[in-house]
Design a protein with these regions (language model features):
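Electropositive nucleic-acid engagement tracts
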Residues: 5-35
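TOPRIM fold recognition
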Residues: 102-203
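Phosphate-handling DNA/RNA-contact segment within nucleic-acid enzymes
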Residues: 33-128
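Short, solvent-exposed polar/charged micro-motifs at secondary-structure junctions
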Residues: 28-33, 62, 173-178
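Generic structural signal for bulky hydrophobic/aromatic residues embedded
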Residues: 12-14, 43, 103, 177
Length: 203
């Protein structure tokens, strides 16, 4: 069971249950039995697991556990594939990929989380998906992310791809943006109900 992973992804990361259910059903995330870490699986074009990264479900003093499973192939990343789609959207972290998919309700495009700012997983993904012609970079809006986006954009434009860079509207990354948007929506909802209660009391 994924009780702690669900609690972490829904409450801390503000992802919808619908999206988390989708990734669980696709066997792209699971929970370790011993420490209850959430595990993100990267599969190849045949569906074979090639990569797995772990994230602690409890933030101890602001320093959550992060790590890769032993014998990982880092040229694979956490991904969503659609052979009929000609674009891949690239993120640094798995949770950012999930956050974007949740916020935009985007279940159609190819999506890939590099696990860092290194583009080795993108090279592999493009090799396995020759139909892709467009790359959209959704890396973090920080110094490292902006630098990586510029370098990756230049490299793949020279290889003949159409490349765009798209940072979140605000915040450092797509999960930070999603969390802020969801909390803002809750506050607006509570304020509307509070105003309605006042009007009814006055009436």
């Amino acid at each position: 069971m994924l009780f702690r992973s669900y609690a972490y992804l829904l409450k801390t990361r503000c992802l919808s249950k619908e999206v988390v259910d989708w990734f669980v059903k696709k066997k792209l995330i699971y929970e370790t039995r011993r420490y209850h870490n959430v595990v993100f699986i990267g599969r190849d074009s045949f569906g074979t697991a090639r990569f797995a990264s772990m994230r602690g479900t409890v933030d101890n003093y602001g320093n959550p556990f992060k790590g890769d499973v032993e014998n990982n192939d880092k040229t694979y990343g956490f991904n969503v594939r659609n052979k009929k789609n000609k674009e891949v959207k690239v993120f640094e972290a798995a949770i950012d990929l999930m956050s974007y998919m949740d916020y935009k309700r985007d279940g159609q495009s190819n999506k890939l989380a590099l696990g860092s700012t290194w583009d080795g997983a993108l090279d592999r993904f493009l090799l396995e998906n020759p139909q892709i012609k467009r790359i959209s970079l959704y890396l973090d809006n920080d110094k490292a992310g902006r630098k990586a986006a510029a370098l990756i954009r230049k490299k793949y434009i020279e290889m003949g791809y159409h490349v765009k860079v798209r940072f979140p509207p605000y915040g450092k990354d797509w999960n930070e943006f999603l969390v802020a948007e969801r909390k803002k929506a809750v506050i607006q909802y509570l304020n509307r109900n509070s105003n309605l209660d006042r009007k009814q009391a006055i009436g």
